[in-house]
Structure formats: structure tokens, C-alpha cells
Design a protein with these regions (language model features):
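Domain-level signature for soluble enzymes in the chorismate/prephenate branch of the shikimate pathway
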Residues: 1-91
Length: 91
């Protein structure tokens, strides 16, 4: 492949990543809205923000649906960061 072809391919891939990043952000914001609603329900019902069993179930489910190429450890790490970050919206 020539440098020009590689450059075009690189540009296309970067453009695709930009689009995916926008989609991810949209989905994360949708998830955040759900988290806020859950937080309001938990406050009303005087429940704890952190529910370790629910988090474990969520992460276990992600392990079963992960088809790669990310390893389960990578996916779990990313989702743990998302969970921990969005928990603040429930407070």
C-alpha cells in the first residue's frame, strides 16, 4: 500500500473513530440520565447509592456478552470507571 493509500485509510479510520466516539458519548449521556432517575428513586426509598451485588451482576453480564477484541479485563475496567464516575450523579 502506498503512503497516499495508507493516509486515506488512516483518515477514514480516524473519521470512523470520531463518529464512534460521538455515539459513545450520546449513549453515556443516556446512561447518565437513567442513573439520575435511579438516584432519585433510591433517595425517595432511602436506599444506598452503592449496590455491590448489582454492580457484580452487571459486570458478570458484560463478561458473557463481550465478543472482543477487548479482553474481559479491559471491558470490565472501562465499565467500572463508568459506574464509579456516574455514581456521583446519584448523590
Amino acid at each position: 500500500m502506498s503512503n497516499n493509500q495508507e493516509g486515506q485509510s488512516l483518515e477514514k479510520l480516524r473519521s470512523r473513530i470520531d463518529g464512534l466516539d460521538s455515539e459513545l458519548l450520546k449513549l453515556l449521556n443516556e446512561r447518565a440520565k437513567c442513573v439520575i432517575k435511579i438516584g432519585k428513586i433510591k433517595q425517595k426509598e432511602k436506599k444506598d447509592v452503592s449496590v455491590p451485588l448489582r454492580e457484580k451482576e452487571l459486570l458478570d453480564r458484560l463478561r458473557t456478552v463481550n465478543k472482543g477484541p477487548m479482553t474481559d479485563a479491559m471491558a470490565i475496567y472501562l465499565f467500572q470507571q463508568i459506574i464509579d464516575t456516574l455514581k456521583d450523579l446519584q448523590k
